Amino acid sequence: MVHICRLLVLMGMLLCLSAQFASSQHWSHGWYPGGKREIDIYDTSEVSGEIKLCEAGKCSYLRPQGRNILKTILLDALIRDFQKRK
C-alpha cells in the first residue's frame, strides 16, 4: 500500500512538471488562435452595406439562434436514428 501511495505521488509530481515544460499554444493580446489578428473595422474608410446593417441589429445570420439549438439537435438525432433503422 505504501508503494502505491509513493507511486501516485511521484506520478502526480511528474504530471505537474511535464505540464510546465510542455509546449502549448500561446497568443498575445490582439491575436487569436490560428494567427488571426483582431481587425478594427472602424479604422477603415470603406465599410460595406452589410456591416452597417449588422451594426444596426438587422443582421439575422450573426444573431445567436438560442431557441433553435435544442430543436436542431433533437431533429438531427431523430434523422440519424431513422437512417440507422433503414
Curated annotation (Swiss-Prot):
Stimulates the secretion of gonadotropins. InterPro entries: GnRH, Gonadoliberin. It comes from Rutilus rutilus. Keywords: Amidation, Cleavage on pair of basic residues, Hormone, Pyrrolidone carboxylic acid, Secreted, Signal. The modification Glycine amide is found at G34. Belongs to the GnRH family. This is Progonadoliberin-2. It is found in: Secreted. The gene is gnrh2. PROSITE patterns: GNRH. One of its GO terms (molecular function) is gonadotropin hormone-releasing hormone activity. The modification Pyrrolidone carboxylic acid is found at Q25. Residues 1-24 form the signal peptide. GO terms for cellular component: extracellular space. The keyword Secreted applies.
